[in-house]
């Protein structure tokens, strides 16, 4: 499970730890400054949700954890606990995949600590699992630089045209 790689990386990092799935392709130049702007010090975590009002789990192909923030440390402790104490954690949840677990914990913590950055918070998305609603990452500002080739997109070598819900200007999306 990738969550253990996340825990390990966080113990070896300082300031921010960013997770990016291995099936993510950086298609355009991305400067350090542009990358750093995606990680505001005022947020304890950044991630890609599925749009306003969505009841589904986040897209966990890219997220950043502000390791200097105590709330983030609490999140990481709970994220690990849910797996380590499975009988009192993950096995009590409706679904067991990392994105569902991640979303469950974030949603609980946002009640008292709402200072998160959801890259898709203001985005309109179709119903989840259809069209771009099931593939929000490329429809956020992250799509300017990266493509997440999840699922059968790996075989195609690129996300589907039907996944794109916003006007993309980058050359990568024109071909």
For every predicted segment, state its role.
Residues 5, 62-64, 146:
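Conserved hydrophobic/aromatic beta-strand scaffold that supports enzyme active sites
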Residues 14, 58-74:
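Conserved nucleotide-sugar donor-binding
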Residues 67-173:
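Catalytic core and acceptor-binding pocket of nucleotide-sugar-dependent glycosyltransferases
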Residues 21-25:
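The conserved acidic donor/metal-binding loop of glycosyltransferases
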Residues 51-64, 90-94:
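A recurrent flexible, glycine/aromatic-enriched loop bordering the glycosyltransferase active site
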Residues 26-58:
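Conserved donor-nucleotide/metal-binding helix-loop-beta segment in metal-dependent transferases, i.e.
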Residues 1-18, 44-49, 58, 95:
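A conserved donor-nucleotide-binding helix/loop in the catalytic core
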Residues 18-20, 46, 63, 117:
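Hydrophobic/aromatic beta-strand patches that form the interior of the parallel beta-sheet core
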């Amino acid at each position: 499970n990738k969550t253990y790689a996340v825990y390990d990386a966080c113990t070896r990092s300082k300031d921010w730890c960013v997770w990016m799935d291995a099936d993510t392709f950086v298609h355009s130049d991305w400067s350090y400054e542009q990358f750093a702007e995606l990680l505001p010090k005022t947020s304890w975590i950044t991630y890609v949700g599925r749009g306003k009002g969505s009841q589904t789990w986040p897209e966990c192909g890219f997220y950043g954890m502000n390791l200097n923030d105590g709330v983030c440390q609490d999140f990481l402790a709970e994220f690990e606990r849910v797996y380590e104490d499975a009988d009192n954690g993950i096995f009590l949840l409706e679904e067991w995949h990392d994105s569902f677990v991640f979303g469950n914990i974030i949603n609980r913590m946002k009640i008292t600590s709402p200072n998160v950055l959801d890259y898709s918070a203001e985005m309109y998305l179709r119903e989840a699992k259809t069209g771009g609603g099931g593939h929000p990452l490329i429809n956020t500002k992250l799509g300017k630089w990266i493509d997440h080739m999840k699922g059968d997109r790996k075989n195609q070598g690129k996300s589907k045209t039907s996944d794109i819900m916003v006007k993309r200007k980058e050359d990568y999306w024109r071909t």
